[in-house]
Amino acid sequence: MRRLNLFPLAGILFSVLVLNVAAVDAAAQSGDFEIAQHGQAVGSASFQFAATKDGYDSTSLVKVAMQELDYALSKNEELGAANQLKHVMLSATVNGEAVSVVAAPDSAQFLLNISANGKSSTTRLAPHPGAVFLPDFDAGALETLLALAVTQNNRDLWAILPKGAGSIEPVQLATYPDQEGTLDGKAVTVHHLVATIAGANTELFSGPENQLLQAELPQEGFALVRKGFVLSPAAKPIAPTGDSGAVPAAPAN
């Protein structure tokens, strides 16, 4: 059973509050999202989690099609029973450029093997049990962060960012008053948080089971919205911080 609470190729993406939540069957856990910029649909994102004997397998898909950005991503992860990252394989294209990343813990390090621009490199990062692998527009990564927040009691959370040579950054979460919304036409209470990663803020809205419903991303005007969800009133943009560039960047080698 996977317990959910509460969040970049470019680095999108906690005074904390531990929420009491019901256990959710990971085998049935999935989500479909619209990617929008200034309210206009520009792509889609989806994820699915399946229970295994040792934890969970997760799959994420992302597609963005804009005049200045053609972005596609496929990510497969193996997670432990407490949502620890065991292995990840990512394949992506950014404006026609192919990128692949394979990552896994290795002894006292976490290794990122990156292939981009026709070159390969390996980056060694400090390992953290509360780390999540966070590519751009990846709703599944945000869902995993919500689960990790419960596992870690909202403490010692980290984001592995597959940007440049790759890095790992602390995650801070601030809680705000609950809001209201509808999911598939039914009224729901919406939990509201702001995650800060590498100096950039992302607003997170989660449902009664703390499943991801919406994320307002640091890139100007971009949002992930679960299909069938409507926030009332609509989210107001938070003050921009950090790198708010709109286009994901392939790792530089």
Predicted regions and their residues:
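Acidic/charged, solvent-exposed loop-and-adjacent secondary-structure segments enriched in E/D, K/R, S/T
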Residues: 114-140
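Positively charged n-region of N-terminal signal peptides that target proteins for export
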Residues: 1-6
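Bacterial N-terminal signal peptides
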Residues: 8-20
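N-terminal compositionally biased or targeting/leader segments
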Residues: 10, 141-143
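Acidic, serine/threonine-rich low-complexity disordered tracts
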Residues: 24-107, 111-116, 144-253
